C-alpha cells in the first residue's frame, strides 16, 4: 500500500528483508515480506517505496544486503527471520557486523512483548542498529509475532497496554536525519517529545 505522490507527508524508502534458506529456494512460500509490507502500508501515512529482498541464512549475504539497502537510501530496514539459537540463525551477527551504533532497547522491548505470549521468547536474539542515516531492526519470523512486536499489546477496547517498538521508530529516524514518519494512531501511535512534533503540512 503506497499513497499518492501528491501526499503532504514525506516520502520514505524502506528495505524489507526476509531471511530463510527454504523460502529463498522455493521450498515454501515466503510470508515475511507480505506481512511487513501490509503492516507498514496500514501503519504509515507516508508514501512508501519498498525495497524487498528474499535471501538465505548466509551471514555475508545478509550483511551485504543490509549495506546495499542503506546505500540505496533506505531510512528504515526491517528484517524477519534468522534470530533464534539454531546453527543457521545468523541475522543478529550479520546486522551487528554493519553497525555504526547499537540500539539495544528495541530487542529488549520485543522480547518483553513476546514473553506475554510464549516463554520461548527468551531464545530470540533480535538486535537493532544504526548505520549512517538508516535504522536496521531484526524482527521475529512469524507474521503474527511481527505485528505484535511492532504494535505492542492492546486491551479488548483497543487501548494500549504495552507499547510496540514502532512507536519509537519515527523519532529515532528524526534523530539520524531521515524523513518525518507519521503513523496512523489506530495501528501504532508514534511518540515524540513536544518540541519534535512538526506542524501538519498543507496538502498539495
Summary of predicted features, one role per range:
Residues 1-204:
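Non-catalytic beta/alpha edge segments that cap or flank active sites
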Amino acid at each position: 500500500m503506497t499513497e499518492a505522490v501528491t501526499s503532504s507527508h514525506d516520502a520514505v524508502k524502506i528495505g524489507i528483508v526476509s531471511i530463510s534458506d527454504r523460502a529463498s529456494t522455493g521450498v515454501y512460500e515466503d510470508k515475511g515480506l507480505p506481512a511487513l509490507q501490509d503492516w507498514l502500508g496500514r501503519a504509515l501515512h507516508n508514501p512508501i517505496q519498498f525495497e524487498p529482498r528474499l535471501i538465505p541464512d548466509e551471514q555475508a549475504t545478509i550483511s551485504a544486503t543490509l549495506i546495499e539497502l542503506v546505500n540505496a537510501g533506505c531510512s528504515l530496514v526491517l528484517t524477519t527471520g534468522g534470530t533464534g539459537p539454531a546453527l543457521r540463525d545468523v541475522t543478529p551477527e550479520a546486522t551487528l557486523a554493519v553497525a555504526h551504533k547499537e540500539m539495544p532497547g528495541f530487542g529488549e522491548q520485543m522480547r518483553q512483548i513476546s514473553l506475554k505470549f510464549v516463554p520461548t521468547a527468551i531464545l530470540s536474539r533480535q538486535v537493532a542498529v544504526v548505520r549512517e542515516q538508516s535504522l536496521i531492526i531484526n524482527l521475529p519470523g512469524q507474521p503474527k509475532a511481527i505485528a505484535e512486536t511492532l504494535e505492542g499489546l492492546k486491551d479488548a477496547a483497543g487501548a494500549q497496554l504495552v507499547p510496540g517498538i514502532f512507536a519509537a521508530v519515527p523519532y529515532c529516524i528524526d534523530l539520524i536525519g531521515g524523513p518525518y514518519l507519521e503513523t496512523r494512531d489506530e495501528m501504532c501511535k508514534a511518540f515524540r517529545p513536544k518540541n519534535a512534533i512538526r506542524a501538519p503540512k498543507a496538502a498539495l
